[in-house]
Amino acid sequence: MVRNISLFGQLLGALPRNSFASLVARHGAERCAKGFSTWSQLVAMLFSQLARAESLRDICNGLASCMGKLSHLGVATSPRRSTLSYANIHRPAAVFEEMFWTTLGTFRGAGRLGQHKPFRFRNHLASLDSTTISLCLSLFEWASYRRAKGGVKLHVLLSHEDYLP
């Protein structure tokens, strides 16, 4: 039997689900939850980032269109907009923050965040990226850099040890 696992399924499979369950229990995130679990909320929020969803409607419609493919990941049904909004407001964000740091520690320990080079630098190695983000002058009058254009300049310093800004 041939099994095709989606890229999103592989990403969710890399998350330590047992440590997520212990974080949910420790924070009491599902204390008043009736049908929409914290895991389903995490899946919805990761989906929104990867799909570049801009609204709750985009998230819910995108998950509804993929329901047959996401049911094996622990998401029973696509959430309603009001349910997702209520969960985003009332569930503690500390659960997801600790999940990020736990996952980052797991990947650092397993060596998944890059190969160790045969040489080492004496000082910290970082890359600098500079990007211009265009903005509409009618909405952001403070962002003028030309007479007819608006924008801001973003500088990001990326560490090569853990790939975090």
Predicted segment positions?
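Conserved, well-structured functional cores that handle cations and Mg-NTP chemistry
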Residues: 1-165
